[in-house]
UniProtKB/Swiss-Prot annotation:
Transmembrane segments: none
Name of the top EC class for this enzyme: ligase
GO molecular function, one term: asparaginyl-tRNA synthase (glutamine-hydrolyzing) activity
Its EC number(s): 6.3.5.-
Protein name, as recorded: Aspartyl/glutamyl-tRNA(Asn/Gln) amidotransferase subunit B
SMART domains: GatB_Yqey
Organism: Ureaplasma urealyticum serovar 10 (strain ATCC 33699 / Western)
Length: 477
C-alpha cells in the first residue's frame, strides 16, 4: 500500500571475538562441550568479584570510532539490569545503561533510489551474555559456556524505511565488525542477534504508529521476511479498523510468520542501578587516540584502495563480507602485491577447488597459502601460463608441494635463454616467409600467428614476454 510507510529501528547484539570472557579469565569458544568453559565468576558463586577484560573496552572504542560516534572514554562505568530467569545466575546482568561507551553515530547505506543515506545509531554499549537455553521434551537445559561472554549492543534510531534498507544496514554493520576484528559476526553461532522494532503510519505523518518488537532473528534473510510479514499484518489490522497492540513477537522461520510472545503492558521493570563492584574506568584522550591509531584505515578507505588497485566493487564487497576469506586474501597479497591476481587465483579458483571438497578457507594452513602466493608471483612474472597455474594450484592443494618443485615435476620449466629463443625464431620465420611478408600490412595478426607457432614448437615452454620482445626486434629490423 503506497499510502502507508514502515518505520524500522533495530537492536543488534554482537558477541566479541575476545580470547576470554568479559569479567573472568574463562576462555571463549563456540565449539566446546556444554558447561566446560565456566568458573566461579561465571556462575556467580558467593564471594566472587568481576574484573573487566581490557580487550572488551578496546573493541568497544574501535567500534564506536568506526561508527563515527562520541565515546564516553573518560568515564566508563557499568550498571546492573535486574531480572530473574534461568539463564542469569546472578539475578542481574552487568551492562551499561547510564553511560554507554559510544553515542550518536551512523552507518551510511544506499537507499532504494541509489542515493546515499545515513542511518543514525543512538548508542552502543557493553554487556555480558546469558547462558544458552535449549528446550527438549518440556525440559530446559542450560549451557553456561555462553554466560559472561562479552557483547556489544548496537541500537539504531528509527531511520530505516524498508526491509531492503534494513538488510543493507546489517550487511554494512557486519562488514565493519569483521574489518575491525571486533566479532566473527556469524549469525549461525549466535554471534550476531537482531531485534527489530517496527511500526507503520500514513505516508507523510509525523508521529509514529504503535511499535512491535520482533526478537532474536537468526539470519539477515529472515530479518527481511519478518519485516515484510509484520508490515502486512499491521496494515491489515489498520485497514480493518482494528488497533495494533504494542507487543513482543518472535519470527517462526518454519512458517515465515511472526508469533505473539507477550504484551508490552507486561514489560519488565529492570530496576537499573550502578554496578559498584566495578570501579569506573577513566581513559585519557591521549590513550584513546594512541589506541585508535593502531587501526588507521576505515572500511571506506580500504574500498577506495582496492578499487584503485583494480578490484571491482562486487569482489570488494565479497571480501569485506567474509572475514576468514579477507584474512587469507590479505596474507597472500602481502606476498604478491597484486589484489586482482590474488582475487582471481585465491578467491575464485582456489575457493571453487576447496568447495568441491566441502572444505572452508579456515581449514587451510598459512603454509599452503604461502605456496599459493608464491605460485601467483610466478604467474604474474609470466613464468607460468594460466593453464599451467590452474594445474599447479590443484597440485599444491592435493600434495602441499611448493610451486617450483611442481614446475619441475610437471615439465613446466620455461625457456628463458635469449640465444635459444632467437634461434627458435630464426627457424620459425624461415619456415613462414609468406606470413613474414604480410607484417607491414597486418602487424597484429602476424605477431599473433608467430607467437602461436612459438608456443606450438616449444609446447608453451618459451617465456611469452621474452619471446615477444625478441620477435618485435627481429620484425622491426
Amino acid at each position: 500500500m503506497q499510502n502507508f510507510e514502515v518505520i524500522i529501528g533495530i537492536e543488534v547484539h554482537t558477541a566479541l571475538n575476545t580470547k576470554t570472557k568479559m569479567f573472568s579469565n574463562t576462555p571463549t569458544s563456540h565449539k566446546s562441550m556444554a558447561n566446560t568453559l565456566i568458573n566461579e565468576i561465571d556462575l556467580a558463586l558467593p564471594g566472587t568479584l568481576p574484573s573487566v577484560n581490557q580487550e572488551v573496552v578496546h573493541k568497544g572504542l574501535f567500534l564506536a570510532n568506526a561508527l563515527h560516534m562520541h565515546t564516553n572514554h573518560q568515564f566508563i562505568a557499568f550498571d546492573r539490569k535486574h531480572y530473574y530467569y534461568l539463564d542469569l545466575p546472578k539475578g542481574y546482568q552487568i551492562t551499561q545503561n547510564y553511560f554507554p561507551i559510544g553515542q550518536n553515530g551512523y552507518i551510511q547505506i544506499t537507499d532504494e533510489n541509489n542515493n546515499p543515506k545515513k542511518i543514525r545509531i543512538k548508542q552502543i554499549h557493553l554487556e555480558e551474555d546469558t547462558a544458552k537455553q535449549t528446550s527438549v521434551n518440556n525440559q530446559v537445559y542450560l549451557d553456561y559456556n555462553r554466560a559472561g561472554w562479552p557483547l556489544i549492543e548496537i541500537v539504531s534510531e528509527a531511520d530505516l524505511r524498508s526491509a531492503q534498507e534494513t538488510v543493507l544496514f546489517l550487511e554494512e554493520l557486519r562488514k565493519i565488525l569483521l574489518f575491525n576484528d571486533i566479532s566473527d559476526a556469524k549469525m549461525e553461532d549466535g554471534s550476531l542477534r537482531v531485534d527489530v522494532n517496527i511500526s507503520i503510519r500514513p505516508r507523510g505523518a509525523k508521529s509514529f504508529g504503535t511499535k512491535v518488537e520482533i526478537k532474536n532473528i537468526n539470519s539477515i534473510s529472515n530479518v527481511a521476511k519478518a519485516i515484510n510479514y509484520e508490515y502486512n499484518r499491521q496494515l491489515n489490522l489498520i485497514l480493518l479498523n482494528q488497533s495494533v497492540e504494542q507487543q513482543t513477537r518472535r519470527f517462526d522461520d518454519s512458517t515465515n510468520t511472526t508469533v505473539f510472545m507477550r504484551s508490552k503492558n507486561d514489560a519488565i521493570n529492570y530496576r537499573y542501578i550502578r554496578e559498584l563492584n566495578i570501579a569506573p574506568i577513566y581513559l585519557s584522550d591521549e590513550y584513546v587516540s594512541q589506541l585508535l591509531s593502531t587501526k588507521p584505515y576505515s572500511i571506506n578507505d580500504l574500498r577506495q584502495e582496492l578499487l584503485q588497485k583494480g578490484l571491482v566493487s562486487s569482489a570488494i564487497e565479497q571480501l569485506l563480507g567474509d572475514g576468514p576469506l579477507f584474512k587469507a586474501f590479505k596474507y597472500v597479497n602481502k606476498i604478491v602485491n597484486n589484489p586482482s591476481s590474488v582475487y582471481k587465483w585465491l578467491c575464485l579458483e582456489f575457493i571453487g577447488l576447496i568447495n568441491k571438497n566441502t572444505q572452508i578457507i579456515e581449514d587451510i594452513s598459512m603454509e599452503l597459502l604461502q605456496k599459493i602466493g608464491a605460485m601467483i608471483v610466478l604467474f604474474d612474472q609470466t613464468l607460468i601460463n594460466g593453464k599451467q597455474t590452474k594445474t599447479i594450484l590443484e597440485k599444491i592443494y592435493l600434495t602441499n608441494k611448493d610451486p617450483q618443485t611442481l614446475i619441475k615435476e610437471l615439465g613446466f620449466e620455461q625457456i628463458t635463454d635469449e640465444n635459444e629463443i632467437t634461434n627458435l625464431w630464426n627457424q620459425i620465420l624461415a619456415n613462414n616467409q609468406e606470413m613474414l611478408l604480410q607484417y607491414e600490412e597486418r602487424p597484429d595478426r602476424v605477431e599473433k600467428f608467430f607467437m602461436g607457432e612459438m608456443m606450438k614448437l616449444t609446447k608453451a615452454q618459451a617465456n611469452p614476454t621474452i619471446s615477444f620482445n625478441i620477435l618485435k626486434k627481429i620484425l622491426q629490423k
